[in-house]
Design a protein with these regions (language model features):
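Short, well-ordered beta-strand segments
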Residues: 42-44, 122
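Adenylate-forming
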Residues: 12-16, 26-33, 43, 81-83, ...
């Protein structure tokens, strides 16, 4: 049982069908091509694992052999920046609200932390306001990626920063095998 985020009301429990071994291999290959998860990479999971996206992302990070995973007991924008610097985090999955809260930090607070280790940041769970996404790309570089999906089916489309900059408002291309 995995729970929805509650965007349409209270979180709802959803049963997902398990894939066959071949289906799971294809899924892992597709996700790895998009997310570049694997050995030598380090991540922080700043969201609760009882929600679909962080739960699935965490499992994929383990299955794909990521070197380090840091779990945050609760999201705090400055704490996330501190942890990125401390652990030299390469990968991060967020939601737009986390971007908004980080951007609300005073500029001098944001500038205290070195986040240049980040190679790949992906957000999901809700549409990201275009001005917020642009500010994140300006701050962290063109490493901000986005996917759309649903608890019931997982990720279905993917969009990187360059695609978004060229086609604002796009939800990206359909992901194969998803």
């Amino acid at each position: 049982m995995i729970y929805t985020s509650g965007t349409t009301g209270r979180p709802k429990g959803v049963r997902r069908k398990s894939g066959t071994p071949d289906e799971m291999d294809n899924l892992y290959e597709t996700i790895n091509q998009a997310f570049d998860i694997g050995p030598g990479k380090r991540t922080i999971i700043p969201a609760p694992l009882y929600h679909s996206a962080p739960n699935t992302y965490g499992i994929l990070c383990v299955v794909m052999g990521m070197d380090e995973m840091v779990l945050m007991p609760r999201f705090d924008p400055e704490d996330l920046l501190r942890l990125i610097e401390k652990h030299k985090t390469t990968h991060l999955q967020t939601v737009p609200t986390m971007f908004i809260r980080m951007l609300k930090l005073p500029e001098e607070e944001r500038a205290k932390y070195i986040v240049s280790s980040l190679e790949f940041v992906v957000h999901a769970a809700a549409p990201c306001p275009p001005d917020i996404k642009q500010q994140m790309i300006d701050w962290w570089g063109p490493i901000i990626n986005e996917y759309y999906g649903a608890t019931e089916v997982g990720a279905v489309s993917f969009l990187d920063s360059n695609q978004w900059l060229g086609h604002r408002g796009s939800v990206g291309e359909a992901m194969k095998n998803c």
